[in-house]
A protein has these predicted regions:
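Solvent-exposed, non-transmembrane regions of membrane-associated and secreted proteins
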Residues: 16, 21-250, 296-304
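Acidic/Ser-Thr/Pro-Gly-rich, low-complexity N-terminal segments
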Residues: 1-21
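Alpha-helical transmembrane segments forming the membrane-embedded cores
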Residues: 261-304
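Hydrophobic alpha-helical membrane-embedded or membrane-associated segments
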Residues: 34, 38-42, 258, 281-289
Length: 304
């Protein structure tokens, strides 16, 4: 008698419940692909922030600083010497040949300060004063105010406006790391040294600069009396990454904000309509990404 094909046959041995061959490897590949995609998107976002979006951030800071400095100049309260708060506006910079106009110079040359504009190096006299004044600026990000500085020609005008008046400098030369330094200016003379970075090859090489550029300009006449100097910045070089506890603490908090924003977006995606989740969640996630990028950029060399 033949067996009924519709009846279930019971197997007395052990049942192999493992997934079919190859499924585990496929899941690993899918997970790895998602991780690589996420990393690529994060790197792409950070490059977009550095090369494009950071310019809007500096433009906003410059507008605020310009209004603050103009008010101080009108009231006669702009600084003429130490102490000067880090990040405070100290001068207006114009370089006609490079189309640099009314650029606000802030106090300090750390990465945090150079996000707002060119920075005056602590420990040197303020622009326009007797002695050597050093002003550093970025070449690639945050508006790249000194991107064309290596191409400046001898004799180009550099005009600086401070609480002590308007001062005109003439460029005398460009030098790089290892080149001989010019002799100190004589009594009653002033020099302005503009500093930025440059790379070799494509424009992307500026993200990893290899050389520091120094442009020396001599004051034509009428150096102002030098005010008190602040303590020199202990940071060894403007091309070195600087990690401080404050920036790390701020970055940790910003990452928590980003994780919270992502968690909220996922929750809204599963509970609300897709349109409502995008409208409510996308701006919050972008703002958190912007915050993380802005703080994270402070860990990079100050001149890029």
């Amino acid at each position: 008698m033949s067996a009924d094909p519709t009846r279930t046959r019971v197997h007395d041995g052990e049942v192999d419940a493992s997934p079919p061959p190859g499924r585990g490897e496929e899941q690993v590949r899918v997970a790895g692909g998602r991780v690589m995609l996420a990393l690529s998107l994060l790197i792409g976002w950070f490059l977009l922030y550095l090369l494009v979006l950071s310019s809007f951030e500096q433009n906003h800071a410059q507008n605020v600083l310009y209004g603050e400095l103009r008010t101080q100049l009108a009231e006669g309260t702009a600084p003429t010497g130490a102490p000067v708060r880090a990040g405070a506006p100290v001068a207006l910079l114009d370089i006609p040949s490079l189309d640099v106009e009314s650029l606000v110079v802030v106090e300090g040359t750390r990465s945090r300060q150079l996000q707002d504009g060119p920075g005056h190096r602590a420990g040197t006299v303020l622009p326009g004063q007797e002695g050597v004044s050093v002003v550093a600026g970025r070449s690639t990000s945050y508006g790249k105010p000194f991107a064309d500085l290596p191409d400046i020609v001898r004799g180009a005008r550099v005009v600086v406006t401070t609480a002590q008046g308007e001062f005109e400098y003439l460029v005398t030369g460009t030098r790089f790391d290892g080149d001989p330094m010019p002799a100190p200016p004589g009594e009653g003379a002033g020099r302005l040294t503009l500093v930025t970075s440059t790379g070799t090859g494509s424009w992307l090489s500026r993200l990893q600069p290899s050389r520091t550029v120094y442009v020396d300009a001599e004051l034509r006449s009428g150096a102002a009396a030098a005010g008190p100097r602040s303590a020199p910045d202990p940071e060894p070089t403007l091309l070195a990454s600087h990690v401080d506890r404050l920036s790390l603490a701020e970055l940790a908090l910003a990452l928590q904000v980003l994780l919270g924003a992502l968690a909220g977006f996922v929750w809204a995606w599963n509970r609300w309509s897709r349109k409502a989740a995008w409208i409510a969640g996308a701006p919050v996630v972008v703002a958190a990404l912007w915050l993380v990028s802005s703080i994270g950029a402070r860990l990079l060399p100050a001149l890029i």
